[in-house]
Every structure is written in structure tokens, then in C-alpha cells.
């Protein structure tokens, strides 16, 4: 009887000890997993930061390549962000995607010869056809960027129109993502408000009139009216 009790108590103690060690093992494993998850999160954040730095560097390099549109990409990104925030329908994550995609909307111009990109005058038909290809080239460059979904669409479609009369594919409103509609308007806004080799910048009233005429045709109706409102309130083109 005594031996049996001793056996049971010994067995109980062993089980308790094993349980304690197992729980400690689990705790250590959980701590290790948390540390590993933390390390992975830090590594992913570092990778994302490197990607963002690369995006910024590429946009700056692109602006430097095009002598007539210095800081164009940055302005388009800033205008796009202002328009998006005025729409009150996007998340903070969406704002980042819109801003960074806008920074790269003209990345395909890297493949356009400098003699065409910086020509001091209007382009010939042949040169214009080459210039138009920057949209497709940009899409090819950006299509595999996982951290910037739809950035390729911003590059490909930012010269498309709501009425289907744009390029490169002539697609219409229902096929154009909101990101594209925003970037397209911001790109046109900067084009009109900047000095070009063949013309001076347009005044505010002219730009407002162009967005009024283009609403529902060239531009998304909602986006066009937001741009007009921001200009009239002095939140856009305040220095123009």
C-alpha cells in the first residue's frame, strides 16, 4: 500500500514537473515567436522604407531628366493627395498608395529619348507617338510592385479620358479606377499651371473653365468639381 502511494505521489510530482517545464517551454516558444514576428515586422518595414526611398529617388531622377517639368511628379502627387482627401472616402493606407503612385505616374518617360522629351517646340507626329508610349512603358515597369497595388494603372491610364477619347487604349469611365481619375486630373492641373517650352502657364480662371468644360468628358465629374472648389478656396494654386 505504501509503495503504491509512493508511486502515485512520485508519478504526480513527475507530471507536475513535466507540466511546469512544458509551460515554460511554451512561454519561451511564444516569446521566441514574438521576437521572430517582431524581427520580421522590422525587416518588412525596413524593406518598405527602402522601396519608398527608391520610389522618391526615381521620381526625382525622372523630373531631372525632363528639363521643362521640374518637380512635376512631386506636384502631381501633392495635388492627388489633396483631391483624394477632399473626397472623404479613402483610408490612410489608400492616401499613401495614391501619393506614391502619383509620384511614379510618368516613370515610363525614362525610356523616352531626351531629344524628344526636351524638344523646345511642338512634337512631330512620329515623336508624339513615341512620347505616348511612356504610358505603356510605365505600366510595364510598375506592374510587379506588390507594395504599390494599381501603381501600374496610374502610369498606363493617366492620359485616358472619361469619354473614351484618351490614350493609349481609349477606355471609358467604368474601366478607370478612382486612383487613375485622381492622378489624371492632378496631372492636367499641373500641366496647365506650369510653364512649358511652347507656352506660358495658364491663369486660374482659364484652368477653372477647362475643368468645368471637361467635367464628365475628360475628367471624372466629382474629381473635376473638387479641383475647381480647391482652386476657388485658394487651397490649390495659391501661389499662381
Q: Model segments located where?
A:
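Juxtamembrane or sensor-core-proximal signal-transducing alpha helices
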Residues: 7-42
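Short, flexible segments with low predicted structural confidence
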Residues: 11-12, 19, 47-48, 102-103, ...
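Signal-transmission coiled-coils
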Residues: 33, 37-44, 51, 61-66
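Conserved small/polar residues in nucleotide/adenosyl-binding loops
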Residues: 1-5
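Metal-dependent catalytic cores of enzymes that make or break cyclic nucleotides
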Residues: 52, 56-240
